[in-house]
Regions:
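Single, function-defining residue in the core of a domain
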Residues: 1-59, 63, 91, 101, ...
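An active-site-proximal beta-strand-loop segment
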Residues: 144-154
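Adenosine ribonucleotide-centric catalytic and binding domains
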Residues: 59, 65, 145-147
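Active-site- or DNA-interface-adjacent structural scaffold in DNA-acting proteins
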Residues: 76-144
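A short structural micro-motif
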Residues: 66-67, 108, 344
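Extended, structured, electrostatic nucleic-acid-contact surfaces
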Residues: 65-76
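Glycine-centered flexibility motif
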Residues: 28, 74-76, 128, 349
């Protein structure tokens, strides 16, 4: 294997320990806490997410009580915790500490990208993912039916709506009320906050097709936000004018441009066409797809050979709009990574507070892996595995050195890493 450009230990050192210590004081996260201080919970979750693909409270207990973890983060070897104390702490610990820690780390790590590398990060993919749990465990959530196998125990789901910029989530919200089952209700909550933060309006928001109401399109436009989404091919609209001419490039990759038009969308409430102009790009797959509906029961997505994209950006070419929408798939890959490799497919804590703490810590750990895999040109799974193994090698060497009392052999930065948690 070729030499790594960035070591795992270098990335761990980038975690702003001084700022975490300040956050501990300002948020009072450690009030009445002994063994499980805010910083210890922070590092415990990072270590556990890196160590296992599926984490539980009992695994967190096991991790905390290992000499290896305590050595790495300079915790007294006689310190002990139980899974019960971890459960209680997650349900009551101050959430603000983790929210602000995520913001600080996101800002620090995103600065590692050059100006040229950061340009694609103005393309913000917004989408949602659901995670389910049995009703008797999850305190809040959407009831979505019965357990597989005909059991009588219902299941509940939590919706996570995220704005992904290609590096990490710029913003995320957790929804447990059935009002937010519809993307037309959940996604505007995230979009409004994003647009307010983007004072120069440089971002282009790539939206799931569930975001489809005229009211939502108008709200984004009124806030001067730019978006691209997908609409149904039978959407009622009034053509204002065409943007195509003899110089228009109709090659959109695996799609061929059929039309590029300015339209007025139909307002169902007012029963008339809206006066706001939107741009609709009509394209067709070059290789026809099988549109036969499957014989199995249940709701299935309709397969079509045509794709209609909608945007309020009239400056980009149709090809750039199509390429931007294709990037929407990146957030699906990100969700898959979180669920398969960072224990995001189930609930470590079922309390509302604990769920949000785990969310922020999952995203922080994902950032560590994202930087490592990018710099060392690896995939998600191998990147995470290699990160952890490299970290373990370093800890073994550290423990050996400490046991031999050869502290002079330790670099200053290594000692500083150990001293992060008193």
């Amino acid at each position: 294997m070729k030499d790594k450009k960035v070591r795992a230990i270098d990335i761990l050192r980038m975690i702003p320990c001084e700022e975490l210590a300040k956050l501990s004081l300002s948020t009072k996260v450690d009030y009445c806490a002994k063994a499980l201080s805010g910083e210890r919970v922070f590092y415990l979750l990072v270590y556990a997410f890196l160590a296992a693909d599926e984490v539980s409270q009992r695994k967190l207990e096991t991790v905390f009580n290992t000499d290896m973890f305590k050595t790495l983060f300079n915790i007294s070897l006689d310190a002990k915790v139980t899974h019960g104390s971890i459960s209680t702490r997650l349900s009551k610990i101050d959430l603000t500490f983790f929210e602000k820690a995520y913001e600080v780390i996101y800002q620090r790590f995103s600065r590692m990208y050059t100006k040229e590398e950061a340009l694609p990060m103005n393309l913000i993919r917004v989408d949602s993912s659901m995670v389910a749990e049995t009703c008797n465990k999850l305190k809040k959530g959407f009831t979505v039916g019965k357990k597989p196998g005909g059991g009588k125990t219902s299941r509940k789901q939590i919706k996570y709506t995220m704005a992904y910029d290609g590096f990490s989530a710029k913003l995320t919200e957790v929804f447990s009320d059935s009002t937010y089952l519809s993307e037309d209700m959940a996604m505007p909550e995230v979009l409004t906050q994003l647009i307010k933060k983007d004072s120069n309006h440089e971002n282009l928001y790539v939206l799931d097709r569930g975001f489809s109401s005229l009211e939502n399109y108008d709200n984004v436009t009124e806030q001067r936000g730019k978006f691209v989404g997908r609409i149904k091919t039978n959407r009622k609209m009034e053509v204002v004018r065409s943007l195509m001419d003899e110089t228009t490039d109709t090659d959109l990759g695996n799609l061929e441009l059929q039309d590029d038009i300015v339209v007025h969308l139909y307002d169902r409430e007012k029963k008339e066409f809206s006066e706001t102009e939107y741009r609709v790009i009509k394209a067709r797959f070059k290789v026809p797809r099988d549109t036969t509906r499957p014989a199995n029961k249940g709701k299935v997505k309709r397969v079509e050979n045509e794709v209609y994209l909608i945007t309020n950006d009239f400056g980009l070419t149709a090809k750039l709009i199509a390429e931007a929408y294709k990037k929407r798939w990146d957030i699906e890959v990100f969700f898959k990574f979180l669920k398969q490799n960072l224990s995001f497919s189930h609930f470590i804590s079922t309390s509302e507070n604990g769920i949000k703490v785990i969310l922020y810590m999952t995203l922080i750990t994902a950032m560590l892996v994202m930087i490592y895999k990018r710099e060392n040109e690896m995939g998600y799974t191998i990147g995470k595995f290699s990160f952890f193994m490299e970290m373990q090698d370093w800890v073994v060497k550290l423990m050996t050195t400490l046991q031999n009392e050869k502290l002079s052999l330790l670099a200053y930065e290594d000692m500083r890493l150990r001293a992060r948690i008193p």
